[in-house]
Amino acid sequence: MAQRRSSQTTKKVKRKNVTNGVAHIHSTHNNTIVTFSDEKGNVISWASSGTIGYKGTKKKTAYAAGLAAQNASEKAKEHGIREVSVRVKGIGQGRDAARKQIEVSGISVSQIVDVTPQAHNGTRPPKRVLKREKAR
């Protein structure tokens, strides 16, 4: 008879020795995602307001974004990150809180770049809502 194999396999996290990297902060109206990568774009660590444990409207707060940045930066420091270039995308509440938390965590910030996409006369806007008067 065949032997039963264990269904769960665990992977040992390999430590990446990277000193310089890029911190991507993607802040939307509902959530903030912080990703640390090396200069080529390979992801080292990431965290979001949702992975920390917040749900619903609490995910979009600046406090939750700061905790996400703190969590991601601690993981990145374990892999050797010491200096980052911060790229901020989006218009959410947590963009400044996440950036400040990265600076406070002990990782030096070399530059801050806003890469929020700007529409150059993008898509057609929705049609205007007609206001109706109440019948007396």
Curated annotation (Swiss-Prot):
Transmembrane segments: none annotated. Keywords: Ribonucleoprotein, Ribosomal protein, RNA-binding, rRNA-binding. One of its GO terms (molecular function) is structural constituent of ribosome. One of its GO terms (cellular component) is ribosome. SUPFAM superfamilies: Translational machinery components. The keyword rRNA-binding applies. Residues 1-20, 115-136 are annotated as: Disordered. The keyword Zinc does not apply. GO terms for biological process: translation. Located on the platform of the 30S subunit, it bridges several disparate RNA helices of the 16S rRNA. Forms part of the Shine-Dalgarno cleft in the 70S ribosome. Belongs to the universal ribosomal protein uS11 family. Part of the 30S ribosomal subunit. Interacts with proteins S7 and S18. Binds to IF-3. This is Small ribosomal subunit protein uS11. It comes from Mycoplasmopsis pulmonis (strain UAB CTIP) (Mycoplasma pulmonis). The lineage of its organism: Bacteria, Bacillati, Mycoplasmatota, Mycoplasmoidales, Metamycoplasmataceae.
